[in-house]
């Protein structure tokens, strides 16, 4: 089990093509603060191949079929359904 499973579950349940969340909302779902790197580096939000990564945070959005599009200045991330 990953600390990012609640985020994955939220995305699995989402019926729309995209979901915009404040970083604070993501933190509420996972029950803890995001790492500093999520606030400082777009790379933390990388859309890695779920078959080739060990990064549990990336798996939270790639396994349900989303791409993360962060806006670090606004402290938001938009998850867009791939396809």
Predicted feature locations:
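Ser/Thr/Pro-rich, acidic low-complexity intrinsically disordered regulatory segments
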Residues: 1-19, 34-83
